[in-house]
């Protein structure tokens, strides 16, 4: 029993992990189609409802009629004047009504691993079922007259297509003599710069506030789990990082962190995001809200404090709009290049940020070296093993020493019989004399749990893992192994029930776990022996729904652990009992005497 103490600790902790996984991932995933169907039905049934969009106190943003979702994407795009967008990473257009970013596709990403599948659509017009857009406007007063808002028709006054080398200029002059010139530029990835020059040609000073919002009319259909944040996100100056789920604003009032100077706001999905970086020198209020009138929609917005433009003078305000894939090096570069506070938190690195991000950096380095993220996972596992080698050496050395004193422990058990207190005291004295810490092997297991979670986060949340192939049938390391033993791995023409799907890599992982546990003899207690025997089987089925990259890591880590334990035990002069244990397991047991 003492020899297997550390394994039972590991098993108990792992079971907790896997139960949580089943609760937070597998069950929600089974309802994914139902949720998607309900959302689609809701979008189809919604009819146009006139009326202005509501606003929370202190956040009175211009609104307008809420359009129905009765148009196709092509119909909605075709009915308005637009400026085309064409970059190496993006294609789409800007709607001249409201200068709205509501047509954007990501050239470098497709919906599935099939290279002929459609590219990812990020933004779509409000008139479509998947309406999702970003816009920037102003709030004035009677003195300012009409200012740019959702219904403003801008004039294209410079350029004809937005590319990294050709910005475009939009202009609008109101009835009071205030001129707005908007210059929009874009880089070769996902960042737009929106620079507004506001000139006051009236005889009196005017004050106006800028606003910006990211609005979407639906929620993503990916399973909602606690290891991943999808919803509202931003950094509100001194109030720090804000992560607000969709359900929070559905059930409660809008979330308003408070007045901020510096920061950003937006909406994030697992791999994609849309954010606005307001003018950093002017204080602003951020709000995350849900509106249920007409078509339900979710909105992340800001409103700045008013700026005053003197007669005959002009001011310049710059907003940044990020719309695209959350590529780690791109996001990190934007944080530095534009001095955006904590912009790297746009990617959900989790609680173990200090481990997760360096681990990604390591894996990304090996990927660039070898060109395969699967290979990068294997090499990263070796590096982690080397880092933890001193702890593992101590763990296995402690286990070896425990085996050495096993005969003495058996003698003590016979000597003390049912005197458990006396036996415990005698064993503690034996540990002291032999310089053995019976809990020494537990710490390496506990310390490595954050590493496991960090690796899981890297594989699950970073877009670099999306559709990243390994070898053979693994074409997406972020998805479960697509094979299943139910149909003999594709030889039979049926799929079988989803809960019985068991791929090749989960089976390999189960075998390695079985061998690792057999490095030690089966415990004498019948209950523990049953747990010892069946745990690899349970883990095999539970890990069938894990991302393939994580299962490959676990199988490889088990293999390295078997080799490591064998080498250390040989160095300690302790017999490696793997083959003897396997032989005793599969050999015929003698029949009990009658």
From Swiss-Prot:
Transmembrane spans: 7-27, 369-389, 443-463, 488-508, 532-552
GO BP field: protein insertion into membrane; protein transport
Swiss-Prot/TrEMBL keywords: Cell inner membrane, Cell membrane, Chaperone, Membrane, Protein transport, Transmembrane, Transmembrane helix, Transport
HAMAP family cross-referenced by the UniProt entry: YidC_type1
Role, per record: Required for the insertion and/or proper folding and/or complex formation of integral membrane proteins into the membrane. Involved in integration of membrane proteins that insert both dependently and independently of the Sec translocase complex, as well as at least some lipoproteins. Aids folding of multispanning membrane proteins.
PANTHER family for this protein: CYTOCHROME C OXIDASE ASSEMBLY PROTEIN COX18, MITOCHONDRIAL (PTHR12428:SF65), OXA1 (PTHR12428)
Subcellular location: Cell inner membrane
Protein name: Membrane protein insertase YidC
Biased composition (Low complexity): 37-65
Organism phylogeny: Bacteria, Pseudomonadati, Pseudomonadota, Alphaproteobacteria, Hyphomicrobiales
GO cellular component: plasma membrane
Gene name for this UniProt entry: yidC
Molecular function GO terms recorded: membrane insertase activity
Membrane topology field: Multi-pass membrane protein
Similarity field: Belongs to the OXA1/ALB3/YidC family. Type 1 subfamily.
CDD domains: 5TM_YidC_Alb3 (cd20070), EcYidC-like_peri (cd19961)
Subunit structure: Interacts with the Sec translocase complex via SecD. Specifically interacts with transmembrane segments of nascent integral membrane proteins during membrane integration.
One Pfam family, short name: 60KD_IMP
Region of interest: Disordered: 36-73
């Amino acid at each position: 029993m003492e020899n297997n103490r550390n394994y039972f600790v590991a098993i108990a902790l792992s079971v907790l992990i896997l139960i949580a996984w089943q609760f937070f991932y597998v069950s929600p995933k089974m309802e994914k189609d139902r949720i998607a169907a309900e959302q689609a039905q809701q979008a189809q049934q919604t009819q146009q409802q006139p009326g202005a969009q509501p606003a929370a106190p202190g956040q009175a943003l211009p609104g307008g009629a809420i359009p129905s979702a009765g148009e196709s994407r092509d119909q909605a795009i075709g009915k308005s004047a637009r400026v085309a967008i064409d970059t190496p990473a993006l294609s789409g257009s800007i709607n001249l009504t409201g200068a709205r970013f509501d047509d954007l596709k990501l050239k470098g990403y497709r919906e599935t691993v099939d290279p002929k599948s459609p590219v990812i659509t990020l933004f779509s017009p409000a008139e479509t079922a998947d309406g999702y857009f970003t816009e920037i406007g102003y709030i004035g007063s009677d003195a300012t007259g009409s200012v740019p808002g959702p219904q403003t028709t801008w004039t294209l006054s410079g350029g004809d297509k937005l590319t990294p080398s050709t910005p475009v200029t939009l202009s609008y002059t109101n009835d009071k003599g205030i001129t707005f010139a908007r210059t929009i530029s874009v880089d070769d990835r996902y960042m737009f710069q929106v620079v507004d020059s506001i000139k006051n040609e009236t005889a009196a000073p005017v004050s106006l506030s800028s606003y910006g919002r990211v609005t979407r009319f639906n929620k993503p259909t990916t399973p909602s789990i606690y290891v991943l944040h999808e919803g509202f996100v931003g950094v509100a100056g001194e109030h720090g990082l804000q992560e607000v789920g969709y359900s929070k604003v559905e059930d409660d009032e809008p979330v308003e962190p408070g007045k901020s100077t510096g920061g950003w706001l937006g909406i994030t999905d697992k791999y994609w995001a849309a954010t606005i970086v307001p003018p950093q020198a002017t204080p602003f209020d951020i709000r995350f809200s849900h509106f249920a009138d007409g078509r339900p929609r979710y909105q992340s917005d800001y409103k700045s404090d008013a700026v005053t433009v003197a007669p005959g003078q002009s001011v310049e305000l710059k907003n940044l709009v990020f719309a695209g894939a959350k590529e780690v090096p791109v996001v990190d570069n934007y944080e530095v290049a534009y001095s955006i506070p904590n912009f790297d938190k746009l990617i959900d690195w989790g609680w173990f940020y200090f481990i997760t991000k360096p681990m990604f950096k390591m894996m990304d380095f090996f990927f660039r070296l070898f060109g395969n993220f699967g290979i990068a996972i294997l090499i990263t596992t070796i590096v982690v093993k080397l880092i933890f080698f001193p702890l593992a050496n101590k763990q296995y050395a402690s286990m070896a020493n425990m085996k050495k004193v096993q005969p003495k422990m058996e003698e003590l058990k016979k000597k003390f019989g049912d005197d458990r207190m006396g036996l415990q005291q005698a064993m503690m004295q034996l540990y002291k004399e032999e310089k053995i810490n019976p809990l020494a092997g537990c710490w390496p297991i506990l310390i490595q749990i954050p590493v496991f979670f960090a690796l899981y986060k890297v594989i699950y949340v970073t877009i670099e893992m999306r559709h990243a192939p390994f070898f053979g049938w693994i074409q997406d390391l972020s998805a479960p192994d697509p094979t299943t033993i139910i149909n003999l791995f594709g030889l039979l023409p049926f799929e079988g029930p989803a809960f019985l799907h068991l791929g090749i890599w989960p089976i390999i992982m189960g075998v390695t776990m079985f061998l690792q546990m057999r490095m030690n003899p089966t415990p004498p207690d019948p209950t523990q022996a049953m747990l010892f025997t069946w745990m690899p089987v349970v883990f095999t089925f539970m890990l069938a729904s894990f991302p393939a990259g994580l299962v490959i890591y676990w199988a490889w880590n088990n293999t390295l652990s078997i080799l490591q334990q064998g080498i250390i035990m040989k160095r300690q002069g302790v017999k490696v009992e793997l083959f003897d244990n396997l032989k005793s397991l599969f050999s015929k047991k003698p029949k009990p005497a009658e």
